[in-house]
């Protein structure tokens, strides 16, 4: 069911922007957090707070395969509960799995970290994008 947009079924598409921290690479579909300088870094398992999801930079003709690097202007959304977005998975997941925040901006079905959402499809690629309903 993967498509060509990260925001699949979002009630309000209020886009936000911030700079990517130097030395960091962020892919569309990664979960991100903001550091003390309000620059984007990859979310880790211990991260808490808003579920910020990196978007593709469609305004510049970029797609899901075009990454942001340090100094780039990152476009992201904070989806609401019930919104459907594509997120990157850390390992294989099944449809209906409860997904949690993991390292490197990805989600997975194990552990006790903050619940991000429910997998709406199965995924087998370690770097794959799947549709997720936000919790």
Provide a role label for each language-model segment.
Residues 1-135:
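Surface-exposed, low-hydrophobicity beta-strand/loop segments enriched in small/polar/acidic residues
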């Amino acid at each position: 069911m993967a498509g060509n947009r990260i925001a699949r079924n979002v009630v309000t598409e209020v886009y936000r922007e911030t700079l990517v921290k130097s030395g960091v690479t962020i892919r569309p579909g990664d979960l991100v957090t903001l550091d003390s300088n309000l620059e984007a870094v990859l979310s880790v398992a211990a991260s808490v707070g808003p579920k910020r999801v990196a978007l593709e930079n469609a305004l510049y003709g970029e797609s899901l395969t075009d990454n942001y690097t340090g100094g780039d202007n990152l476009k992201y959304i904070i989806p609401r509960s019930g919104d459907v977005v594509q997120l990157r998975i850390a390992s294989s997941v099944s449809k209906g799995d409860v997904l949690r925040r993991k390292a490197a901006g990805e989600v997975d079905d194990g552990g006790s970290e903050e619940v991000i959402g429910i997998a709406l499809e199965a995924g087998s690629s370690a770097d794959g994008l799947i549709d997720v309903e936000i919790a």
